[in-house]
C-alpha cells in the first residue's frame, strides 16, 4: 500500500503535541510492515536549520479564493522515511505553528498544496491519511476539484484521524471563499465554517486515538457539538489506541536520561537511585521509603488540574507523600503550584516548563503518576509511567480507561488506580488508597509495579491496527 501521511506537525521538525509524535512513530512502524509511506508537512521557521540536507523538488501555483499562492516542495529522508515540506514564507515561516488570525487561509493553502503535490513528489497514494482540522478540508477539495482530473486522483481514499475533537477549525463564513466552490453545507456548522466537520462528512473512514474516546465523542458530553455528525458515520468510525516507543525512547533498560537504568527484575534499586537524584535536585526530604507522586503534562483544565488543586494540599498535609510537577500552561495553575512549593518546600517541587532529561527521571523516580483528566483522547503519560514502574491514578475516560487496569484488592490484578466521576473527592480517595498500599503492603505494591512494567503499548501493535484499517479502506468503493 501507498500512504501519504498529512500532518500539520511532525517530530523532530515541528511539535506542539502528540500529533507530531504520531507523525514520526506511525510512519516508521508502517514502513517496517512493508508499506510505502511519505509524510507531508509545512516548512515552518524552525525547519530552516535542516535546509542544507533537503532536495528541492519543484514549485506549484495554487489558485485559491481571489488570489494565487506559490508553494515550493522540498524532500528530506530521515531515518528511512521520506518527508515532504511545503514552503510558503508568508504562511508558514513564523515563530509558532498555530494561533494566527489567518489560520483558516494558511491550512486551506496547505490542503491544496498536498493535493497539488502528487506529480511533483512522484507519489500517487492509495490513501491520504489526514489528521485533525488542519487537513480536514482535503476530502472535500479532493471530491470537488481533483477526482475528475485523472485516475490517480479518482482512486484515492481518505482516512481522518481525530486526535482531539475539541479543536475543530471553526471560522467565520467568509473563509468559504478559499474553497473555490459554491456555498456548501458540508462544511457549515452553526452558521460557521468548520473544517473538521467537512472531514467527518467526506472522509472514507474516520478514527480516533482510543476505543473508549470513539464512543465518548458520539455523546453530547464529549462531542463538542459534532456528536451528531459522528453518529451519522458510526459504521465508518473506530478507535485505535496510540502506542509508545517502548523499545528505544521509553525503555528504562536503555534510557540515556536516567541516572540508573533498570528492568523489571531490578526496578526497586534502579528507581531508588533515580528518586535519590530527583529529591536532591528539587531540594526535598531525602527519605526514599516515602511515596513520590508526579505529574508531567500541560497545566490545563482538561488534564484535571482543577481536581488536583482542590485535593492535593490535603494529601500533602495528611500523608508522607511528596509531589513533583513538570509542565506549563494556564498561569493560574502555574502560580498555584509555585505557591505549594513555597508553602511545602520539603515536600513539593515544580518545574514550570519542560526538560526532556528531567521528565524521564521523573518517570523513573516516581511511585505514583497522576492523570485525572476531564477527558483524554488517548494519553501517553500513563503508558510511559507504567513502563517505568510508576503506577498511574487516572479517571476512567478515553485512552486512560483503555490502557490502565484498575487495582483489585481481592485478586491483586491491576496496573494502576482509577476513579469514574470527575470529582476531587474521588481523586483524593484514590490518592490515599495508593499511598496507604505503598506504605503498608510492599509485597502487593511490587506485584502491581511488575504488572505495569510488563504492559504492552508498543508501536507494532498500533501499526498493525492501522494496517488493518488501511486494508479495509482500500476495499471500499469510491
Curated annotation (Swiss-Prot):
Pathway: Glycan biosynthesis; glycogen biosynthesis. InterPro entries: Glyco_trans_1, GS/SS, Starch_synth_cat_dom. The keyword Transferase applies. It is an enzyme of class 2 (transferase). Coiled coil: none annotated. The keyword rRNA processing does not apply. CDD domains: GT5_Glycogen_synthase_DULL1-like. GO terms for molecular function: alpha-1,4-glucan glucosyltransferase (ADP-glucose donor) activity; alpha-1,4-glucan glucosyltransferase (UDP-glucose donor) activity. It catalyses: [(1->4)-alpha-D-glucosyl](n) + ADP-alpha-D-glucose = [(1->4)-alpha-D-glucosyl](n+1) + ADP + H(+). One of its GO terms (biological process) is glycogen biosynthetic process. Keywords: Glycogen biosynthesis, Glycosyltransferase, Transferase. It holds the Pfam family Glycos_transf_1. Its EC number is 2.4.1.21. ADP-alpha-D-glucose binds at residue 15. PANTHER family: ALPHA AMYLASE DOMAIN-CONTAINING PROTEIN (PTHR45825:SF11), GRANULE-BOUND STARCH SYNTHASE 1, CHLOROPLASTIC/AMYLOPLASTIC (PTHR45825). HAMAP family: Glycogen_synth. NCBIfam families: glgA. Belongs to the glycosyltransferase 1 family. Bacterial/plant glycogen synthase subfamily. Synthesizes alpha-1,4-glucan chains using ADP-glucose. This is Glycogen synthase. The gene is glgA.
